Amino acid sequence: PPVIAGQGTIGVEIAEACMERDLTPDQMICCTGGGGLLAGTSIALRHHFNALEIIGAEPEGFDDFARSIEAGERVSNASGARSICDAIVTPTPGKITFAVNQALVSHGVAVSDDEVLDAMAFAWAQFKIVAEPGGAVALAAALSGKVDITDRKTVIVVSGGNVDHSIFEQALKRL
C-alpha cells in the first residue's frame, strides 16, 4: 500500500494539471508490470474523473495483467519470453495491486518491442524525453493504434529514463 500511495502522486499531479486547464480526460493509458504504478495512478485519477476509462499497457509475452483482467483472477506468464521492457517484465500481477486494478481498469493491451522502440524515438523527437522501454509502452499502445485515441482526450503516462545506451540508440535509428 505505501508504494501504491506513493505512485498515486503521479495521478494527483495529472488530475491537478487537467483541472487547471478545465480538461476532463476520457481515458488514461499506463504501463504495468506488478501493477503499483497503474493502481496508484488509477485511484487518484478515478477520484477526480469517475467516468475515466483506464487501460493498462504491457510488453508482448508479459501480458499477465490483461489476461488476468479477462480471466477475473491472477494468471502468470509462460517462462521463456523476452522483452526490452525489463523494468516491467513480471511473472504475475501483484496480489494487492491486482485487486485494486481489477476494480478500476477496463482492460489491458500488449505492444511489441518494435512498437516500444518507435514510441521511444517519438518521445525523443517530439518532446526530448528519454523514456526507458517499460515506461514507453503506454505511448506505444497509443501510437500503434492498439488503444484508439481518435477524438478522445487521452492521458498517457510515460515514466522512467533508465535506458541502456544501445537500446536508446536502436530507437533513435528509427528517426
Predicted regions span which residues?
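PLP-dependent amino-acid enzyme catalytic core
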Residues: 1-175
